[in-house]
């Protein structure tokens, strides 16, 4: 890498005197290509809740750093992941999500594959000299169910998710005891014109909550709000109050808790006040200035109550657009001649509810991949 793309090993190591990345790290295609290979091709990436693949033949597809991935539960109930391309000539095999047939058929030349990825039939292969059926299967990648969610990893030498996020599953289950019962209730898909790190930076602080999220801020008790850092994950937690602008809570519950987890590299798990539902922000970087996001909302019941429907609409029409407008504006502003190139990370000694020390922790981790 060129000198402009390197960062010192101790970058943001001291959050009390920290500045953000130089702006090139948010805009450069060279930086993005490096991060794509050094970070995303070698990390566990969360792609969905386990309930989306609850039954045999269930499958989903995801696009991660330009790779089309299919995750499928076989007839044997085993979870598997593959690159979603035919080994013959590269045509994509499955689209969207749903229930697969007992074989996967390529739309191009009708090669068929069993749900374990092995080749079932290649038309005319008996008449093709030295055709290698064993080497014509779908190409697998690692997949793991962890903490009630599905993770994939393109690194064939990767160890388990727990090694990447030690202690996270236990803490998440403490925050939300109904994870295994959750079901997808809503998904907002956006191709956001912002670098993936801009989006994480925004999540890693509540300094902006008062000015930019008035409804959310009306429910959050900022004087009872903490942000703790762990190994490759952080936790923002505290106590809430009922608000007509956002969360309408049971008045008999004193100081209901909320939890917001960021996990390396860029998935955010939220347990709102009440602890009986979750929202998850899945980030799938596309290029230096574009990130595909799935904002998923999960409840335990399939037939939604009116309050739940109203809450979904609040997320859709109020809370979600507030964050999208913020990160899109930042991405534009970073390229201005009026931006001095780095911003001061506003960490206070008390590590209060509005302190930005979470950003410093995240940026220090990223810096280790830019030596």
Curated annotation (Swiss-Prot):
Binding site for Fe cation: 208, 213, 323
Effect of a null allele: Mutant cannot grow on carnitine as a sole carbon and energy source, whereas the growth on succinate is not affected. Mutation abolishes trimethylamine formation from carnitine.
InterPro entries attached to this UniProt entry: Carnitine_monoox_A, Rieske_2Fe-2S, Rieske_2Fe-2S_sf, Ring-hydroxy_dOase_2Fe2S_BS, Ring_hydroxy_dOase_asu_C_dom, Rng_hydr_dOase-A
Chain positions recorded as [2Fe-2S] cluster binding sites: 86, 88, 106, 109
EC number, UniProt record: 1.14.13.239
Rieske domain segment(s): 44-152
One Pfam assignment: Ring_hydroxyl_A
Gene Ontology terms: biological process: carnitine metabolic process
Entry function: Converts carnitine to trimethylamine and malic semialdehyde.
Entry's family note: Belongs to the bacterial ring-hydroxylating dioxygenase alpha subunit family. CntA subfamily.
Protein name as catalogued: Carnitine monooxygenase oxygenase subunit
Organism field: Acinetobacter baumannii (strain ATCC 19606 / DSM 30007 / JCM 6841 / CCUG 19606 / CIP 70.34 / NBRC 109757 / NCIMB 12457 / NCTC 12156 / 81)
